Design a protein with these regions (language model features):
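Polar, enzyme-active/binding microenvironments
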Residues: 1-184
Length: 184
């Protein structure tokens, strides 16, 4: 990385062999990338349109998306912005649309087969959220309601295979961390 950072989120694009990381608490709008096939340091890719520490990220091999996150100045400065970049071209992120609520520590997964990005849970307005939202990768737009997690929580690990997705773990209201898994 170009500087010491923590609590970053990232996504990868195997088609062009790049991995993307950022933003972090230290640099809330910075996106960096590495070339997976070679050793070496990260380089500047561009910046996000809004600060988004604690955002979730995913990629479909063409675009990379960042969801929500927060700006400096405290936990109350959350965003509902969906930002994207074209993974093959260096440059700044652009606005894709909005999530249903502003928050951070979301989790998300991309399902290439049915061209959807699914965003799960998160933390907003002093509440651990149970919402599951989605949007299609075919064109920019706002997210829509998909359903609910069994328990609202943030910091969930997610993965999808084009048919379904699994959301595991996370931090529910009142803690401690959970071993709960949801399947969609």
């Amino acid at each position: 990385l170009t500087q010491a950072q923590d609590n970053m989120t990232g996504c990868a694009d195997a088609n062009i062999g790049r991995g993307f990381a950022g933003p972090s608490y230290q640099d809330m709008d910075q996106i960096e990338y590495i070339t997976i096939a070679t050793t070496g340091d990260a380089a500047d890719f561009g910046t996000t349109i809004v600060d988004c520490y604690g955002a979730a990220a995913t990629s479909d091999g063409i675009y990379g998306w960042w969801h929500g996150g927060r700006a400096s100045g405290g936990w109350g400065n959350a965003s509902n912005t969906i930002q994207y970049l074209v993974t093959a071209t260096l440059g700044d992120a652009s606005d894709w649309g909005d999530l249903d609520f502003a928050g951070y520590t979301y989790s998300c997964t991309c399902s290439v087969a049915d061209a959807r990005v699914v965003q799960l849970g998160g933390y907003a307005s002093s509440d651990y959220r149970n919402e599951i939202d989605y949007y299609t990768t075919a064109s920019a737009g706002n997210s829509s309601d998909f359903g609910n997690l069994t328990v609202g929580r943030s910091g969930i690990a997610t993965l999808g295979n084009g048919t379904g997705a699994v959301a595991g773990g996370g931090f529910p209201s009142g803690g401690p961390v959970t071993d709960l898994m949801d399947y969609i």
